[in-house]
């Protein structure tokens, strides 16, 4: 585990049941595991106190029930009628189309418009011109709406997220602040690569979900195969709570198998739901799937297990209660089905959100209370309007009135005109304007309470920062979202001399998007941008042109390699610089070894041979070396440096001496430890019509990829493979050529793996040549 306990903290990896507590200045800590909910018993890892997670939702619920006993009735009632949900899925599964129907059926919009701007309008939630042109969601978009169920109006805060892996940070930040989600799965393609990624993200933030199998009107739709894949690939117990009436072009509606009622969408746009008896030809299937639902629930819910074992027939209320408990407990996902494009099956999903997803006070949210002495302790946040305000800034956008900051309120109220404290800086900021977002439209409000999502202007902050009420005696910090590492880079420069607008764009975009990195290379004198993929960087280059009027010249995309070692070695390095007057002297000795995962620095000095302040300088020297390896100048991964001895000079030793000595020892030991270059390996999923299967498999083999799985459908096949990112440049052109433009693919970072010896030699030679040219 590599931890830098100062202003900057990198990815911290710990045993799964533990997550590190860090000083409040590190409120933007990037976490590689669950980041939101934790409990109280606290051992220590490398001097960093950790907090144990409740092992089950039942343990969380004990705390939640105690909190709810203290809440005022008004807060309980407001929370009962509120749901915070996200819509997530693999690209092109129909998320935005689904969201458009949700907004229409809840009365939030007056007309339905389709993705890609086919009618010159485009879907409401895809408000960027680039989104409408490309037909994909690039930024998550927030809105709110109301849904009436059984004469009660429920308030939904809803976020539509991108499906493309290049924009995965939008999913991360949405799930960080949401209480539940609707996972959309294609009835034809089933569980795809990004579905697996979204599932992993939901688990990371403990977000329960209901699943909607979309595109039931398409040829080859098979909802029960998709449910089987959810069980097998996502390892999530799932069962249908509906069966379709008809399929493909004959899709007419769905049967709710819990209460055995057929539901038909009628009206020009499916706005009317007509209930009827179950068609005779479906009664046997309904009973079969109902029995399977009860059996699955008996495996994940104790109350249903008792009913099942006693041979009793559960009531509708008992089945719904079991589904709700198991779903909120993250043990089960109920599956609904329909077609968003055909306007069928959407309203029952809204009912399922009310019935099965949690209200804000059913989720345990926790922060770190920081005392004036600096001592930190976990504290449970109270979803009460009378408690001191606590909110998390989870998304930034540049609006026409300045920076727009999205905030999730966890505790207390936020009022227009009030002041709040930025926990990281201690500054008090005024909430001059408070709005609720409806995609790119804003609606002013005077105050928002616990569980709400809002936005405000003119606040200088970063994603993941915590805010508190200005008059609060407490200081509470909340953990941020997980930020993945960039895998691709390219050089960029403005064509014109308009460096002011170019710099402004760079600063804005890297502030809004933590996965978009900008750095200046002092050797090449170039600005380097890094991101999650070719499309990710391509979008930003286009946005610089459109939003700032700056055309840019870009270099060839470069892979973000890593440097590592494969054998242990020892080091004994002396840094000596004496040329009259005060000199420099530092000697370090120890061991250098490969390590799986992140980097680690440790020391064990007996007898005070190296003073503590010099040891800290050694750790800083180690951190410096990790940024630029000796082989090709890329970041270092998977090394453990342990200092166990050393020597000082009474006059010439200093922090700089030992920092420099450590850097020299690092380089010397690294080159002796059988160094290797690691390249990013991508998980690739390719779909195309069956007649092109041979061509696609041949293309993957030509790229040196390893095929993991091939699934043949009625009309299409899907190949899952692992390929090096280096071989994937220009892949979209090759795939179009061999499938006549009918193939699709998606990429996701999988792991780092050793390059071939030939490629390693070529990369080193190229790097050495570039260095020589600069001399």
Curated annotation (Swiss-Prot):
Keywords: Elongation factor, GTP-binding, Mitochondrion, Nucleotide-binding, Protein biosynthesis, Transit peptide
Extent of the transit peptide: 1-45
Primary location class: mitochondrion
Recorded superkingdom: Eukaryota
One Pfam family per UniProt: EFG_III
Pathway(s) it belongs to: Protein biosynthesis; polypeptide chain elongation
The protein's name in its UniProt record: Elongation factor G, mitochondrial
Gene source species: Scheffersomyces stipitis (strain ATCC 58785 / CBS 6054 / NBRC 10063 / NRRL Y-11545)
Encoding gene per record: MEF1
């Amino acid at each position: 585990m590599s931890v830098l306990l100062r202003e900057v903290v990198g990815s911290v990896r710990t045993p799964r049941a533990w997550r590190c507590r860090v000083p409040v200045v590190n409120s933007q800590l990037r976490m590689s595991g669950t980041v939101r909910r934790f409990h109280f018993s606290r051992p220590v890892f490398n001097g960093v106190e950790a907090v144990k997670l409740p092992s089950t939702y039942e343990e969380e619920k004990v705390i939640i029930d105690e909190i709810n006993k203290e809440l005022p009735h008004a807060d309980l009632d407001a929370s009962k009628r509120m749901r915070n949900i996200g819509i997530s899925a693999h690209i092109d599964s129909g998320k935005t189309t689904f969201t458009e129907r949700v907004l229409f059926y809840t009365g939030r919009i007056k007309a339905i418009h389709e993705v890609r701007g086919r009618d010159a309008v485009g879907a409401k939630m895809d408000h960027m011109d680039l989104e409408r042109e490309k037909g994909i969601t690039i930024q998550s978009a927030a809105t709110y709406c109301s849904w009436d169920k059984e004469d009660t109006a429920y308030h939904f805060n809803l976020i539509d997220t991108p499906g493309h892996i290049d924009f995965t940070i939008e999913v991360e930040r949405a799930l960080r602040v949401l209480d539940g989600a609707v996972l959309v799965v294609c009835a034809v393609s089933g569980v795809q690569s990004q579905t697996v990624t979204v599932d992993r993200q939901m688990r990371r933030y403990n977000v329960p979900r209901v699943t909607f199998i979309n595109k039931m009107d398409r040829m080859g739709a098979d909802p029960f195969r998709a449910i089987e894949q959810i069980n097998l690939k996502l390892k999530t117990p799932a069962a249908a709570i509906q069966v379709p009436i008809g399929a493909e072009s004959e899709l007419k509606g769905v049967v709710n198998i819990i209460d055995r009622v057929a539901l038909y969408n009628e009206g020009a746009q499916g706005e009317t739901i007509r209930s009827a008896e179950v068609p005779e030809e479906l009664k046997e299937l309904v009973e079969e799937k109902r029995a399977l639902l009860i059996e699955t629930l008996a495996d994940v819910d104790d109350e249903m297990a008792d009913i099942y074992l006693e041979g009793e027939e559960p009531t509708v209320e008992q089945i719904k209660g079991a589904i709700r408990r198991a779903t909120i407990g993250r043990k089960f996902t109920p599956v609904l089905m329909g077609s968003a494009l055909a306007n069928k099956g959407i309203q029952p999903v809204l009912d399922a959100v009310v019935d099965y997803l949690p209200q804000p006070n059913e989720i345990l949210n926790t922060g770190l209370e920081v005392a004036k002495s600096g001592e930190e302790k976990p504290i449970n946040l109270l979803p009460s309007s009378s408690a001191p305000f606590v909110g998390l800034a989870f998304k930034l956008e540049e609006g026409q009135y300045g920076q727009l900051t999205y905030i999730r309120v966890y505790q207390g109220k936020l009022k227009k005109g009030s002041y709040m404290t930025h926990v990281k800086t201690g500054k008090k900021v005024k909430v001059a304007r408070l709005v609720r977002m409806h995609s790119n439209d804003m609606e002013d409000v005077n105050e928002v309470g616990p569980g709400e999502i809002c936005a405000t202007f003119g606040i200088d902050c970063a994603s993941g920062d915590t805010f508190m009420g200005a008059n609060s005696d407490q200081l509470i910090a909340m953990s941020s979202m997980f930020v993945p590492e960039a895998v691709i880079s390219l050089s960029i420069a403005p064509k014109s001399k308009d460096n002011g607008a170019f710099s402004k764009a760079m600063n804005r975009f890297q502030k809004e998007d933590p996965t978009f990195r900008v750095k200046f290379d002092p050797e090449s004198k170039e600005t380097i941008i890094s991101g999650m993929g070719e499309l990710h960087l391509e979008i930003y280059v286009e946005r610089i042109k459109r939003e700032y009027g700056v055309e840019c010249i870009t270099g060839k995309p470069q892979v973000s390699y890593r440097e590592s070692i494969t054998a242990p070695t020892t080091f004994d390095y002396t840094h000596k610089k004496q040329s009259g007057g005060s000199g420099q002297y530092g000697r370090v000795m120890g061991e250098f070894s490969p390590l799986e995962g992140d980097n680690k620095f440790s020391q064990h000095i007996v007898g005070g041979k190296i003073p503590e302040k010099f040891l800290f300088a050694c750790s800083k020297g180690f951190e410096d070396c990790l940024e630029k390896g000796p082989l090709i100048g890329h970041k270092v991964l998977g090394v453990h440096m342990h200092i166990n001895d050393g020597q000082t000079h009474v006059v010439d030793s200093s922090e700089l001496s030992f920092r420099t000595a450590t850097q020299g020892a690092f380089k010397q030991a690294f080159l002796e430890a059988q160094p290797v270059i690691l390249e990013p390996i991508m998980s690739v999923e390719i779909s195309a019509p069956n007649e092109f299967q041979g061509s696609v498999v041949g293309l993957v083999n030509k790229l040196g990829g390893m095929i993991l799985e091939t699934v043949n459908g009625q009309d299409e096949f899907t190949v899952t493979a692992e390929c090096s990112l280096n071989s994937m440049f220009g892949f979209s052109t090759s795939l179009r050529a061999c499938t006549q433009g009918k193939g699709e693919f998606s990429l996701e970072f999988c792991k780092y793996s050793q390059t071939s010896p030939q490629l390693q030699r070529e990369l080193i030679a190229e790097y050495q040549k570039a260095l020589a040219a600069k001399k």
